[in-house]
Amino acid sequence: MNKYKRIFLVVMDSVGIGEAPDAEQFGDLGSDTIGHIAEHMNGLHMPNMVKLGLGNIREMKGISKVEKPLGYYTKMQEKSTGKDTMTGHWEIMGLYIDTPFQVFPEGFPKELLDELEEKTGRKIIGNKPASGTEVLVELGQEQMETGSLIVYTSADSVLQIAAHEEVVPLEELYKICKIARELTLDEKYMVGRVIARPFVGEPGNFTRTPNRHDYALKPFGRTVMNELKDSDYDVIAIGKIADIYDGEGVTESLRTKSNMDGMDKLVDTLNMDFTGISFLNLVDFDALFGHRRDPQGYGEALQEYDARLPEVFEKLKEDDLLLITADHGNDPVHPGTDHTREYVPLLAYSPSMKEGGQELSLRQTFADIGATVAENFNVKMPEHGTSFLNELKK
């Protein structure tokens, strides 16, 4: 008999809670995502996360300890060697990743692009982090006139290739992206995904078409999600979860437009009758505020998210478990634009915890979540991770 019928896992993308012991190796000494945001805001107002025990993990400005937290609390240390979204999420579901995915804030190395030009017979323009729509305004006309390829990236581990459908036929663009995918399997260029970005229209009026195609990497091993799906449990992926795992182990995928849309979809799944997990990623924290180094926007987004939690609490049943965590840090006052190597919070709550919660021991890997989920549903345990299921007392 499963202890919990439904587990709701929420990943607050990039919400770190202070530098990890190995932060120095990543150039991240002193990083502290929530702590620095709380200072910037002169106190964060997150009463619902505080009730769950956020301030019991660590007190910060506006976030204090409570006498009787509703849930169990601790922080987790990442074991894998990367600090990107895919590594963090894959580890949460039981994998250990020793090859970090690369990000290219200065553009891609010349050797990689030379090889791509040679293999495709087309010149490359762009080669920088850019917004997909702005890059067309800047380089779309040149691409049409020269037949070159617009190559660009973002703050994530991606290589994107844009070309006009009437200049580079779709099939050729897809073939080019497959070549780029092969080249970026090399450790020094390892990107999480290569994306074909076809567009149409005239200079001054370009639009991206729905013919986008992603060449992602599947997780390097079976995750707890695969085990759940193969045992006929539901795995409902909300937000970019299905993309992060390239659809592996997902039984239903719900797309989201924003954090608030993500919270709406979470409430929708709370109203559904299922047995298994609902897995939500709230990406705005990272994409809109962390990379853009906007502590004010980040703080407001955290408060906006916190204000939605009562709806979640209200709908949770006695045999439900809510797990809230993060996948890495992205301190908006830290130098640069990259993620930061930090501990992440872990909060566990069920309405069946009548006595309230207490501190769990420090988790040595994010995979402890995957192990806990696996034990609850009695599926094959991941190679990595230690379950804390039995520490959660009803």
UniProtKB/Swiss-Prot annotation:
Pathway recorded for this protein: Carbohydrate degradation; 2-deoxy-D-ribose 1-phosphate degradation; D-glyceraldehyde 3-phosphate and acetaldehyde from 2-deoxy-alpha-D-ribose 1-phosphate: step 1/2
UniProt: Mn(2+) 1 binding residues: D13, D327, H328
Binding site for Mn(2+) 2: D286, H291, H339
Enzyme Commission identifier(s): 5.4.2.7
Cofactor, how bound (note): Binds 2 manganese ions.
UniProt GO BP: 2-deoxyribose 1-phosphate catabolic process; 5-phosphoribose 1-diphosphate biosynthetic process; metabolic compound salvage; nucleotide metabolic process
One cellular-component annotation, GO: cytosol
Protein's cellular compartments: Cytoplasm
InterPro entries: Alkaline_phosphatase_core_sf, DeoB, Metalloenzyme, Phosphopentomutase_DeoB_cap_sf
Protein's UniProt keywords contain Transferase: no
Cofactor(s) the record lists: Mn(2+)
Molecular function (Gene Ontology), one example: phosphopentomutase activity
Primary location class: cytoplasm
Catalysed transformations (reactions): 2-deoxy-alpha-D-ribose 1-phosphate = 2-deoxy-D-ribose 5-phosphate; alpha-D-ribose 1-phosphate = D-ribose 5-phosphate
SUPFAM superfamilies, per the entry: Alkaline phosphatase-like, DeoB insert domain-like
Enzyme class: isomerase
Keyword terms, alphabetized: Cytoplasm, Isomerase, Manganese, Metal-binding
Recorded superkingdom: Bacteria
Keyword Metal-binding: yes
Stored PANTHER family: PHOSPHOPENTOMUTASE
Family, similarity comment: Belongs to the phosphopentomutase family.
Function text: Isomerase that catalyzes the conversion of deoxy-ribose 1-phosphate (dRib-1-P) and ribose 1-phosphate (Rib-1-P) to deoxy-ribose 5-phosphate (dRib-5-P) and ribose 5-phosphate (Rib-5-P), respectively.
Protein name: Phosphopentomutase
Lineage, top ranks: Bacteria, Bacillati, Bacillota, Bacilli, Bacillales
